[in-house]
Amino acid sequence: MPEFAEPVTPGENDSGITRRHLPHLARAGATYFVTARLRAKPLTPAEVGFVKGQILAGDARYYDLIAIQIMPDHFHALLRPRPGFSLRRVMKGIKGVSARRLNHHRRSKGRLWQDESYDRIVRDQQELEEKIKYMFLNPVTVGLTTEPESYVGWYVK
C-alpha cells in the first residue's frame, strides 16, 4: 500500500482557492484525489489503456502518481504535483495531451474532457487508503469486471 507523505491540516501552506463552478484549493506538496469526466463518447477498452499510458508517461516528471483508474466515461487519479507544477497545470497537461492524441487516433476533433475537474486534498493515510480502495473497486461497482486487479484502467504504485 502506498504511504502518505505527512498529515495535512487545513490552512497549512494554502496558496489559494480558485473557483469556476467548483472550488479548487491549491497547496504546495499536497496529494490530490482528482476526477475528470469525458464530454465526448465513452472510451473503448483499448482507449482506456491508451489514456492510462498517457497519464503514466507524465509520472515522475510533472507529478508523482500514486494510483489511477481510467473508466469509460471518467478517470480518478491520486497524485502529487512535482515542485514547480500546480495541480491546474498538471490537469491541463493530462487532459490536453490525452485529448490531442486520442482525437488523432479516433480521427476526430473537439474537446474530449469536461473543462473542470473535481479535486480534493488527501489529508492522511486513512483517506489515501479509502480513495485507493474506492478507485480499485470502481469498475466492479459499475459492472465492468468482477476482477478489479485485471481491469485495464487500473494502476497503483
Where do the PLM segments sit?
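Short catalytic/metal-binding and nucleic-acid-binding patches
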Residues: M1-K157
